[in-house]
Amino acid sequence: MSTKPQMKNTHLEHPEDSILTGDLSVLDWFVTPGHLSVKIDGAPAIVWGTNPATGKFFVGTKSVFNKIKIKINHSHEEIGVNHEGRVADILHVCFDWLPRTECIYQGDFIGFGGLSEYTPNIITYKFPEVVSQNIIIAPHTCYYAENALRDAVAMPDRAIWYDTESVKFVKPEAYILHRQDSFYDVE
């Protein structure tokens, strides 16, 4: 674990916006070999894992990180108290099917199984066959917290996720390979 200070996962800036402020360093990205993540646009964001304050498994939305009205759900009863409607329905199923882990993860909810096409937000995702699992999650962030979840530090999720009988994990990988040494060498 790095001792370098980390930022909380409140909002991710779009790199292309830096061009508007005169910072052209983002253009070097186009010629730098490496690994990048692909953002999946699901809803709501689901946070799950072991609460370091209680040692118990929990599920929730980003409200688990709230400073004041914290909504951490260690049971179906707590989900019923803290949430309603579609979000409560999703959290109940996530509580039943997401893997128990000592870590804390965040991912976008894509949908319930049984279809081959999903539009959780604006983007439609097509699977080659009907999804047989109960839920589809796109994990993207892991957190480290010693005590309270509101003090958790976000890190990109580098874990390899394998589907289970109940959960389909969506985590596309993308790689960039270029022959140029700098943006100015691009023809």
Regions found by a protein language model. Give the residues of each.
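Internal, well-ordered alpha/beta segment that forms a basic, Gly-enriched binding/recognition surface
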Residues: 81-179
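Short helix/loop capping segments that flank catalytic or ligand/cofactor-binding pockets
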Residues: 47-49, 68-69, 147-150
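Short acidic-glycine loop/turn motifs at beta-strand connectors
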Residues: 49-55, 132, 143
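Beta-strand-enriched accessory nucleic-acid recognition/scaffold domains that flank the catalytic cores
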Residues: 179-187
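Active-site-proximal "nucleotidyltransferase
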Residues: 1-44, 52, 56-118
